[in-house]
């Protein structure tokens, strides 16, 4: 698991998956362009929807929950990044 800034995410020109793990209300209100929504409490129920062949960027409010989930996914062989500081950074 690696931490990346929003700027590093924006510079990554590869095909990638960006996942917003905040509440649905916050996702609807505002999110990163093209981000998929999976609420953090339900994340592991949707693990089969996440392709291992793409880099995955996760973000939450502060970076704490995305760090925790990213660590789990890293152990399962995903190329996973947690956005440092969360959505507002």
Where do the language-model regions lie?
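Structural signal for short hydrophobic segments within the conserved structured cores
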Residues: 17, 36-38, 81
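Catalytic cysteine-centered active loop of the rhodanese-like fold, especially the PTP/DSP P-loop
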Residues: 44, 49-89
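Short, composition-biased local secondary-structure segments
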Residues: 36-46
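Short active-site oxyanion
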Residues: 14-17, 33-34, 54-56
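Short, structured coil segments at secondary-structure junctions
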Residues: 31-33, 76
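Flexible, polar/low-complexity N-terminal or interdomain linker segments that lie immediately upstream
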Residues: 1-30, 40
């Amino acid at each position: 698991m690696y931490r990346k800034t929003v700027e590093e995410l924006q510079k990554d020109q590869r095909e990638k998956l960006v996942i917003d793990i905040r509440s649905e209300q916050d996702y609807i209100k505002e999110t990163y362009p093209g981000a998929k929504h999976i609420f953090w409490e339900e994340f592991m129920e949707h693990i089969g929807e996440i392709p291992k062949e793409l880099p995955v960027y996760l973000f939450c409010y502060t970076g704490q929950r995305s760090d925790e989930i990213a660590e789990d996914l890293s152990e399962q062989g995903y190329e996973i990044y947690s956005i440092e500081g969360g959505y507002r950074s």
